[in-house]
């Protein structure tokens, strides 16, 4: 049997390890989705370069190739890009929360500036107007 102090330390270590594993898992998933997003971007660029819109194109799904109409393929990849963007953004927002929980469990202060969001185009325009005048 472990002493109460040893059990408390063990619970603490297990909690920190679980939180760290969740952070690493999300980071890995973001990297994987970003890789897929880059591959889609390459595919869209190749479709834009190809001027023969009337022809069918070969698309790779896993380990098989399928012949599809050019416009349908482009639309499908664009929808996939939108889905990937949303999923990556969702994971990034979850990651911020998980990192803060991990820091809290370790007794470290919360990261400053970690929850900052970029300015929207409208906010940038307003800021430029204020700075000029």
Swiss-Prot record:
Q: What subcellular compartments does it reside in?
A: Cytoplasm
Fetch the SUPFAM superfamilies from UniProt: Prefoldin
Sorted alphabetically, the keyword list is: Chaperone, Cytoplasm
A single cellular component GO annotation: RPAP3/R2TP/prefoldin-like complex
An example Gene Ontology molecular-function term: unfolded protein binding
Q: Does the keyword section mention Aminoacyl-tRNA synthetase?
A: no
Principal location class: cytoplasm
Q: Name one GO biological process term.
A: protein folding
Entries under Pfam families matching the protein: Prefoldin_2
Annotated family: Belongs to the prefoldin subunit beta family.
Q: What is this protein for, i.e. what is its function?
A: May play a role in chaperone-mediated protein folding.
Could you give the subunit structure recorded for this chain?
Component of the PAQosome complex which is responsible for the biogenesis of several protein complexes and which consists of R2TP complex members RUVBL1, RUVBL2, RPAP3 and PIH1D1, URI complex members PFDN2, PFDN6, PDRG1, UXT and URI1 as well as ASDURF, POLR2E and DNAAF10/WDR92.
Protein name, UniProt field: p53 and DNA damage-regulated protein 1
**Classification lineage:** Eukaryota, Metazoa, Chordata, Craniata, Vertebrata
